[in-house]
Curated annotation (Swiss-Prot):
Pfam families: HATPase_c_3, HSP90. GO terms for molecular function: ATP binding; ATP hydrolysis activity; ATP-dependent protein folding chaperone; unfolded protein binding. It is found in: Cytoplasm. Homodimer. The keyword ATP-binding applies. Its main location: cytoplasm. CDD domains: HATPase_Hsp90-like. Keywords: ATP-binding, Chaperone, Cytoplasm, Nucleotide-binding, Stress response. Residues 553-624 are annotated as: C. It comes from Salmonella paratyphi B (strain ATCC BAA-1250 / SPB7). Residues 1-336 are annotated as: A. This is Chaperone protein HtpG. InterPro entries: HATPase_C_sf (IPR036890), Heat_shock_protein_90_CS (IPR019805), HSP90_C (IPR037196), Hsp90_fam (IPR001404), Hsp90_N (IPR020575), Ribosomal_Su5_D2-typ_SF (IPR020568). Residues 337-552 are annotated as: B.
Amino acid sequence: MKGQETRGFQSEVKQLLHLMIHSLYSNKEIFLRELISNASDAADKLRFRALSNPDLYEGDGELRVRVSFDKDKRTLTIADNGVGMNRDEVIDHLGTIAKSGTKSFLESMGSDQAKDSQLIGQFGVGFYSAFIVADKVTVRTRAAGDKPENGVFWESAGEGEYTVADITKNDRGTEITLHLREGEDEFLDDWRVRSIISKYSDHIALPVEIEKREEKDGETVISWEKINKAQALWTRNKSEIKDDEYNEFYKHIAHDFTDPLTWSHNRVEGKQEYTSLLYIPSQAPWDLWNRDHKHGLKLYVQRVFIMDDAEQFMPNYLRFVRGLIDSNDLPLNVSREILQDSTVTRNLRSALTKRVLQMLEKLAKDDAEKYQTFWKQFGLVLKEGPAEDHANQEAIAKLLRFASTHTDSSAQTVSLEDYVSRMKEGQEKIYYITADSYAAAKNSPHLELLRKKGIEVLLLSDRIDEWMMNYLTEFDGKAFQSVAKADESIEKLADEVDENAKEAEKALEPFVERVKTLLGDRVKEVRLTHRLTDTPAIVTTDADEMSTQMAKLFAAAGQSVPEVKYIFELNPDHVLVKRTADTEDEAQFKEWVELLLDQALFAERGTLEDPNQFIRRMNQLLVS
């Protein structure tokens, strides 16, 4: 063949092929869904390009995909008359994987076949799924608008290399022939192939036809029979659509193997006319946190496909939402640049955002278990919402879930509505603490007084929490209050002490002055506190001071961190504080004060500037 050359697969392709064949074999029939889905995409792309260049149809505007098989040759062929590919596109699409993060994704694969199967499904195997059932795959293709002699031949046994060559192909589009492995004869059975196509492809708008052979007058007559509904699912009446159809359509557009958690299908008429079909996946995509992760909705205008991954219709904190929007108000020649500045886009974004938040609120109300699944997968992303979307902050806040002293569990199951319903009489604020871990939050000395008073505290231990709480300032008219910061409401609780305690506290004023003199400007203030029960001392920050957790976030991001000036608070009822106050020897007094401060700093920050000095001091005082 003219222009023939043999090329090696990109190393990631070889690895993916091996993993896929072994991980997906139990669900091998999906190869047909994937190949028909690709054909549907090729038809969508041709329709879009033909809007500005109708000649691309080459006189054949009836788009379809045809499936045929040859029992003697043991081949199955899927052919479309969509946009097709030129030689460079064949090499790019069939010889390499252009997705960023592919290498790290493949390295994450392990020996758990069920988990690997889900991960590969999320990754989107597309064309390569043909090798699950075929030991050789042949592709013949020609790009729409190219001359017949610019056709391309591609063939591979999926073992490290492929052959590409130039051919003459009179009709545009792509024809994929699978040379089936031994034992895969079920895919040469007419009834079996029909049932798979009906199962997976009823929802797509592209007609799927199967070859029909009949004997007439001693001759074989070939005709094509359409076997799917070939009506875009979102254009149908909701009452006519079964859950299975919604699930299969999700898998088609999301390239996912698992059913979604929930969906919302709506047709809106009036000032704006559009149809939306929005899905919440049941698991996070493998590249959710990748900077180059593509997200957004499929965009159709008047049922004509325009683009994938139109991120302009969803805020970033809802980037996990999959689905489509079909608008009657946007122009057919719309571009990403036009979308960015369009009033129609902004209005649609606002409406769709509210729709998703309502869908999540309904899921949380109707099925707490499913909502927990959602929260575990996407809670960290949703926590970006309060900072990004002030207009919907209250709705987002209702969807947040936290660990709490009420449940005594690290599971984030407590809603803010739950918390408010349990607030004590006279309690005006929602108390929370941020820490590096659930254990650090749960065992923080800042909680001692509130525990004693039976006041619930939210335990926040995700890295994003401190940043989120800078924007989430109130809920249901109740202000949020970090228990690690100085605050009147906490001091008010702490000041509920008897007269004898006040007298004892007055007697300790000279001790407080000694500590202030010793520490100087290393701390912002030294004072006695009654907010502690078991701990001798803590450090807190002023309301306007940067918190410890925020300082850690700045440091982790490589930014300069201003020095945090702490308030050093001492528990006058604790034996170590009393012993320190009674110590007259200045050197010994200094050692005790430094130990108490180091303990408080260690509890607050989880680290010390000089841990060896801390250990030396503690050992020395233990034996003295």
